[in-house]
Structure formats: C-alpha cells, structure tokens
Regions:
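Outer-membrane beta-barrel pore domains
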Residues: 1-180
Length: 180
C-alpha cells in the first residue's frame, strides 16, 4: 500500500519516568556521580473508519527504557559513559519522528535496542561523543507513520520477508555538541 498522510484517528500517550541522580549516597564517589533512569510508556490508538496500524480496532502498545550514566574509569576524568536498553511491543507508537539518524529512532523500536556511549566534556559548552546503537526488530513498522498500511507484522512472517523487512539496524557515530 502507498503511505498517506490522511486523518486515521487519534492516539493517547502516557509516560512514567523515574530518575535517580547519585545512586550511591556516600557508598563510593563513582555511585555518587551515577545517574540511573527507568521509563515506562504506553500508546493507545483510537482509529477512525480508515483504520490505524492495519485495523479499525483500538490497540495498546508499550515501551520500557532503562539507562545508566556514570563517570568513565578511563582518563580524562571529565568523561562519562552510558548504557541504555529499551523494548517496544507490537503496537508501540512513539512520537520520535524528528530522529536525525539514518537508522531511525531507537525509542520507536518494536523489539529491543541497546546503546553504549562515551561523552567527553571539552569546555563548559562543548563536548565530544561516540555512540553505538543496535536495534533488533520483532515487528515491522517501527519508524513508520500510522495509516491502515502501517500494520505491524512479525519480523519472521511471510509478509515481512516478502517486503524485505529490516530485521536489525546499527548506528555508529562520533559527534561534537555545543550547548548554548
């Protein structure tokens, strides 16, 4: 089917986020400077008669996102390292269409995604970073729009295979970031 930008209904989104900055409380300097987070998000479609995600029935999706960021044990001591993992269900819909990578949004993944990164602060406003993201899809359509043509198929299904569905994507990048 040809993707379209027609009105296909509404969507409800909800997110709960827990973030702890300094998880050691005096146990060690490393833990005192560690940030951890956990996020649970839900999307619920309310399609009109045109259908959304391949059906006119309402579908609920979810996403879990966990991460930790801490001081890098390798000098210089102003560097930080982080690890993040997220998992999205078959009907998960994110609002991350502004993603700026060729691989697409890891948060939109219907499956699992892992990211490891290192950020080096160069000045108060300038930093340098490297990251690696691996996305493994369980269902098709992770970064697509809604319409009836957006039905998610199991990645191992005949429909997915016939349409050349992407099973895995990687993003490796080095970047400079300036904070205004």
């Amino acid at each position: 089917a040809t993707p379209s930008f027609e009105d296909v209904g509404d969507i409800d989104l909800a997110t709960v986020l827990f973030k702890a900055e300094g998880i050691g409380d005096g146990i060690s300097e490393t833990l005192d400077n560690t940030t951890a987070f956990a996020s649970f998000a839900m999307s619920k479609t309310n399609p009109n008669s045109k259908g959304m995600l391949g059906t006119t029935d309402s579908q609920t999706g979810y996403s879990v996102w966990l991460g930790v960021n801490t001081a890098c044990p390798i000098l210089p001591d102003s560097a930080r390292i982080g690890f993040e993992w997220n998992k999205g269900s078959k009907y998960w819909r994110s609002m991350t269409y502004g993603e700026d990578t060729y691989a697409g949004s890891k948060i939109a993944t219907r499956g699992q995604a892992w990211e490891v990164y290192r950020t080096q602060k160069l000045t108060n406003a300038l930093s340098f970073g490297v990251s690696y993201v691996l996305m493994q899809y369980d269902y098709t359509g992770s970064n697509s729009f809604f319409g009836a043509d957006g039905k998610p198929y199991d990645i191992n299904s005949l429909e997915a295979k016939q349409n050349g569905a992407v099973e895995e994507a990687r993003d490796i990048r080095a970047y400079m970031r300036y904070k205004f």
